[in-house]
């Protein structure tokens, strides 16, 4: 999972070239709610007037997708796929099938740095959970051969997903929050929302203009060396997502070594480098993840 704190301010000195009907009927006092879902804090702020129903629709979409996707939630569709590994294909909803196909695409095109079948390794380390620990090399060597997205098979006609080897596990946490955020954005736009902030545990999308001056939003990037809420810089954006992954919130410390939550599917160990955080700006959050 990609975690960070983004501070979004409703004004920015950078003026938009055009202003249209999306800037009308806005308020600086948003209709908003914050709920704890998917193991993280989720906030939606809508700056259009009279859009409480859209807020409800947005959270309903989060809950539905979380129930289908969460790998650690017994009974979720991804959990069912994992339970039938090496046994039989599992028919899934259109949403889960779409997410799995996207995960396969990114597994193919990430130069082996992302693998949707990383589940046997992430479930071994369990970084981010109270029982996180460094496994033995033997444990890693035993599970590493199971990490291979090429052993995930799809049937478009039947809309099924099949893990061909027993004990394989999907873990879509690397892109799930981004996918869900994109889906929430679609719901809000369909409901006529033109100005909003969607923040799912630090995966942020800024929709439309800021209500303060009908311009870009200012998105602050968390300083990885400072306390939560301290920005190292800011980015002016509109209709974009800003995703930052860092080692400063979810990690395991063993002796003097810090292991991040970002797993290398080639080694079975967390990636080791000198980067404390990386920010990506893109139109679709799933791409940023």
Language-model segments: which ranges?
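Mature catalytic core of soluble alpha/beta enzymes
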Residues: 1-2, 9-289
């Amino acid at each position: 999972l990609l975690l960070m704190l983004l501070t979004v301010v409703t004004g920015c000195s950078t003026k938009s070239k055009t202003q249209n009907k999306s800037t009308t009927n806005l308020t600086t006092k948003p209709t908003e709610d914050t709920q704890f879902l998917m193991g993280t804090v989720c906030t939606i702020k809508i700056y259009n007037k009279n859009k409480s129903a859209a807020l409800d629709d947005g959270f309903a979409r989060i809950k539905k997708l979380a129930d289908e996707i969460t790998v650690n939630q017994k009974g979720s569709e991804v959990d069912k796929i994992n339970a039938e590994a090496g046994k039989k294909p599992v028919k899934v909803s259109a949403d889960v099938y779409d997410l799995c196909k996207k995960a396969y695409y990114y597994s193919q095109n990430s130069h082996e740095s992302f693998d949707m079948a990383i589940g046997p390794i992430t479930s071994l380390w369990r970084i981010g959970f109270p029982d996180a620990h460094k496994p033995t090399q033997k444990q890693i060597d035993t599970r590493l051969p199971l990490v291979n997205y090429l052993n995930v098979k799809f049937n478009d006609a039947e809309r099924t997903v099949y893990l061909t080897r027993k004990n394989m596990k999907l873990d879509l946490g690397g892109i799930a929050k981004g996918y869900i955020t994109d889906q929430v954005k679609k719901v809000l736009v369909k409901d006529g929302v033109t100005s909003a902030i969607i923040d799912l545990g630090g995966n942020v999308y800024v929709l439309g203009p800021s209500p303060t001056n009908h311009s870009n939003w200012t998105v602050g990037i968390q300083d990885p060396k400072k306390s939560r809420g301290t920005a190292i810089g800011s980015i002016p954006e509109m209709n974009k997502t800003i995703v930052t992954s860092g080692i400063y919130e979810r990690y395991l410390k063993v002796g003097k070594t810090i292991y991040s939550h970002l797993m290398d599917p080639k080694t079975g160990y967390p990636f080791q480098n000198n980067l404390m955080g990386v920010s990506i700006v893109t139109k679709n959050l799933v791409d940023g993840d």
